């Protein structure tokens, strides 16, 4: 299965008639493995800051999580495993696997819990596969 299929079928899936706004699977180095057409263009330093927060949980809290020029307020996640952010009625979930970052961006009517479930379910599956 291609990485794009994981994005298209597992991240951009339909939940009660709604779906994520954007999603991607990127390497720890910031290289894009696959992304939805709506995923924002991001900078390598934004990914580096996310990776730093996985190594040093809480490092993003003072500045926020920035992706594609959008700033998200960092909210409770799972240190070293999941970073969650909020912006207005939407937000972001980032799940770290052994080799990749699984990223989902959502807006209402999708809920934070639905985004977390979609992103973390795929991340857990990839971790189980040694990825």
From Swiss-Prot:
Classification via Gene3D superfamilies: Dynein light chain 2a, cytoplasmic (3.30.450.30)
| Keywords, in A-Z order | Actin-binding, Allergen, Cytoplasm, Cytoskeleton
What GO CC terms are in its UniProt record? cell cortex; cytoskeleton
Q: Where in the cell is it found?
A: Cytoplasm, Cytoskeleton
Report the Pfam families cross-referenced here.
Answer: Profilin
Broad class of the protein's primary localization: cytoplasm
Give the Gene Ontology MF terms in alphabetical order. Answer: actin monomer binding
**Role according to the record:** Binds to actin and affects the structure of the cytoskeleton. At high concentrations, profilin prevents the polymerization of actin, whereas it enhances it at low concentrations. By binding to PIP2, it inhibits the formation of IP3 and DG.
UniProt similarity note: Belongs to the profilin family.
Name of this chain's protein? Profilin-6
Q: From which organism does this entry originate?
A: Hevea brasiliensis
